[in-house]
From Swiss-Prot:
SUPFAM superfamilies hit by this protein: C-type lectin-like, Immunoglobulin
CDD domains linked: Link_domain_HAPLN_module_1, Link_domain_HAPLN_module_2
Every Link domain range: 149-243, 246-339
Single Gene Ontology MF annotation: hyaluronic acid binding
Function field: Mediates a firm binding of versican V2 to hyaluronic acid. May play a pivotal role in the formation of the hyaluronan-associated matrix in the central nervous system (CNS) which facilitates neuronal conduction and general structural stabilization. Binds to hyaluronic acid.
Pfam hit, one: V-set
Domain of life: Eukaryota
Subcellular location: Secreted, Extracellular space, Extracellular matrix
Signal peptide: 1-27
Any single Gene Ontology cellular-component annotation: node of Ranvier
Main location (coarse class): secreted
Annotated tissue distribution: Brain. Predominantly expressed by neurons. Colocalizes with versican V2 in developing and adult cerebellar white matter and at the nodes of Ranvier.
Protein name: Hyaluronan and proteoglycan link protein 2
Length: 341
């Protein structure tokens, strides 16, 4: 007769396999006794500014006999990673995403930390350091977060003129990029209250509300309102842009100038008419406070206030005030210039 496995023995045999399969089905690798070579980072979020040098830590506790370390960036809103650099501990090869700005720190033989020089706005995001040794691959994830400022933007034609791609280009033309949801949320916690919906980098459309009111989503609770999934080509909204610290300086030139005269005034001083992102960055990082409207490169007239006071914008909070888009021939304003250092 064929031999039979007693039920208790069969269950004892089956349970470990079932537990392992269930554990993997949940997306968590089953525990294994093998060594862990990568040390967990002390800080998973690294803060930096545009133009600075950032170091993303990735350190081995011990070195396997043969291995490679692969650095990549996890693209927001996309299920893919972009390769940055691969090293075998002796030699490294970069793959062009960060150009010549990315290198290994090599503080010691177990140091695979990534250095990014001259940090740019598009460098913000999530990065992965992966150890590949042919047996048990492992990785650590880190987030590079830039200090900056979010500003709403609409063109001279009025609100809700941009599809996603036009909003993206508009932010870049104003020395910024489309803000992420995380950046908009941070700006909301710092006081951003805006009743017009705008595109974000991930392709969503949202707006931040601090004071709930009927014309602005109703009398519900404060928060980030969402319009849900939108068609990137067809649907039209404003843009929420993000910018960071400047390499140069913004300064005000007084007068009663037309827009063309404003450009000439800045050129005479070795500068250009400032962009909207330049003015917001100077307000945020340099404390620029000027109670005079000035032309900007997009044809708008704005002024930055860090200390609210009577007859200076009429609002109780700091911010960048706007006079909209006057006629370019209207000789009523000074100008804000931007000069590289």
């Amino acid at each position: 007769m064929p031999s039979r496995i007693p039920l208790p023995a069969f269950c004892c045999f089956l349970l470990p396999w079932a537990f392992t399969s269930f554990h993997k089905a949940l997306g968590n690798p089953a525990p294994h006794p093998g060594p862990h070579y990568l040390l967990p980072p002390i800080h998973e979020v690294i803060h930096s500014r545009r133009g600075a040098t950032a170091t993303l830590p990735c350190v081995l506790g011990t070195s396997p006999p043969s291995y490679k370390v692969r650095w990549s960036k996890v693209e927001p809103g996309e299920l893919r990673e972009t390769l940055i650099l691969i090293t075998n501990g002796l030699h490294a090869r970069d793959y062009g995403l960060l150009g010549g700005r990315a290198s290994l720190r090599r503080g010691h033989r177990l140091d695979a930390s990534l250095i990014i020089k001259n940090v740019r706005l598009e460098d913000e995001g999530r990065y992965r350091c992966e150890l590949i040794n042919g047996i048990e691959d492992e990785s650590v994830a880190l987030t590079l977060r830039l200090e900056g400022v979010v500003f709403p933007y609409q063109p001279s034609r009025g609100r809700y003129q941009f599809n996603y791609f036009e909003a993206k280009r508009a932010c870049e033309e104003q020395d910024g990029r489309l803000a992420t949801y995380g950046q908009l949320y941070q700006a909301w916690t710092e006081g951003l209250d805006w009743c017009n919906a705008g595109w974000l980098l991930e392709g969503s459309v949202r707006y931040p509300v601090l004071t709930a009111r009927a014309p602005c989503g109703g009398h519900g609770r404060p928060g980030i309102r969402s319009y849900g999934p939108r068609d990137r080509s067809r649907d039209r909204y404003d843009a929420f842009c993000f910018t960071s610290a400047l390499a140069g300086q913004v300064f005000f030139v007084p007068g009663r100038l037309t827009l063309s005269e404003a450009h000439a005034a800045c050129r005479r001083r070795g500068a250009v008419v400032a962009k909207v992102g330049h003015l917001y960055a100077a307000w945020k990082f340099s404390g620029l406070d000027q109670c005079d409207g000035g032309w900007l490169a997009d044809g708008s007239v704005r002024f930055p206030i860090t200390t609210p006071r009577p007859r200076c914008g009429g609002l109780p909070d700091p911010g960048v005030r706007s006079f909209g888009f006057p006629r370019p021939q209207q000789a009523s304003y000074g100008t804000y210039c931007y000069a590289e250092k």
